[in-house]
C-alpha cells in the first residue's frame, strides 16, 4: 500500500484563501498522477471553498470536544463535516490540548464520522494517544518542526518506538519532512505515511515539491 501524505497548510500567506485553493489543486493533480493519497489540511475558513473544488480528502487543523449549543468560538465536529471535511488533526504541537480535551475531541470527531489524527511529540504521548483509539497518531518532535531535518534521520528511534507504542494504530511521521527520501525513510521505519507543512507550502514550486515527495514511493 502506498503511503499517506498529509499536507498541513497552517496559517502561512502562501496557503491562505486563493493561495490555499491553488495549493489544493496542485495536491489534487499530483495525487491523480501518482496514485498516492494526499490529504490537504487548510484553515477552517477555507474548508468549504476548497472541498467544492477537489475530490481528494480535506481535513481540519483542529476540533473541539463539544456538542451543538452555546460554544462561541469553538469548532464543532458536525459543522466541519457539513463544510466538507473528512477528518481532522487533534493536538498539533501548535494547538496543544490536555489529554481529557484530546479524548473529547476524538469522540466528537467520531460522532461526526471524521477520521482522526492525534499528534504526539514523544513515545509516551504516542502510547497515551493510541489508547484513545484514533485512526492515526502522528509523531512530531517539536524541535524538528519546520527545521528541514527529518525525524526519520535525526532520531529514528523515536519513530520506531512510536510505532511500537501505538500497538496497531496507524502511525504518521512528521517534523522536518521535505523530500521523497524522507518519506521513503519514514515508511522503512514502519510508519504509514507522513505529515508535513512548510516543505511544500513554502516551496518555490509546491507542485514540484509534492512530485518529489511521491517520486520515491
Regions found by a protein language model. Give the residues of each.
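Active-site-adjacent beta->alpha loops and helix N-cap segments on the catalytic face
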Residues: 16-23, 42-52, 68-78, 93-108, ...
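Short, conserved beta-strand edge motifs with alternating hydrophobic and charged residues
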Residues: 41, 117-120, 138-140, 174
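Structural motif
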Residues: 33, 83, 112, 132, ...
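Residue-level detector of anion-binding/catalytic polar loops
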Residues: 57, 86, 115, 135, ...
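Conserved, mostly hydrophobic/aromatic
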Residues: 10, 43, 80, 140, ...
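Catalytic cores of alpha/beta
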Residues: 120-133, 173, 177-194
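Glycine-rich phosphate-binding active-site loops on the catalytic face of alpha/beta enzymes
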Residues: 86-97, 136-149, 189-209
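Conserved N-terminal beta1-alpha1 strand-loop-helix module at the mouth
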Residues: 1-75, 116, 124-134, 201-202
Amino acid at each position: 500500500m502506498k503511503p499517506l501524505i498529509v499536507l498541513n497548510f497552517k496559517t502561512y500567506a502562501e496557503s491562505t484563501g486563493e493561495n490555499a485553493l491553488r495549493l489544493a489543486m496542485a495536491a489534487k493533480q499530483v495525487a491523480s498522477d501518482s496514485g498516492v493519497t494526499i490529504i490537504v489540511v487548510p484553515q477552517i475558513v477555507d474548508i468549504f471553498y476548497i472541498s467544492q473544488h477537489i475530490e481528494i480528502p480535506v481535513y481540519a487543523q483542529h476540533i473541539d470536544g463539544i456538542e451543538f449549543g452555546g460554544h462561541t468560538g469553538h469548532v464543532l465536529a458536525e459543522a466541519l463535516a457539513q463544510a466538507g471535511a473528512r477528518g481532522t488533526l487533534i493536538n498539533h504541537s501548535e494547538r496543544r490540548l490536555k489529554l481529557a480535551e484530546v479524548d473529547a475531541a476524538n469522540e466528537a470527531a467520531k460522532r461526526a464520522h471524521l477520521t482522526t489524527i492525534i499528534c504526539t511529540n514523544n513515545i509516551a504521548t504516542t502510547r497515551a494517544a493510541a489508547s484513545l483509539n484514533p485512526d492515526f497518531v502522528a509523531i512530531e518532535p517539536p524541535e524538528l518542526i519546520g527545521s528541514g531535518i527529518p525525524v526519520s534521520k535525526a532520531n529514528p528511534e523515536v519513530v520506531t518506538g512510536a510505532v511500537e507504542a501505538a500497538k496497531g494504530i496507524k502511525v504518521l511521521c512528521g517534523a522536518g519532512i521535505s523530500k521523497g527520501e524522507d518519506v521513503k525513510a519514514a515508511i522503512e521505519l514502519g510508519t504509514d505515511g507522513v505529515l508535513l507543512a512548510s516543505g511544500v507550502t513554502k516551496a518555490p514550486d509546491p507542485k514540484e515539491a509534492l512530485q518529489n515527495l511521491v517520486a520515491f514511493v
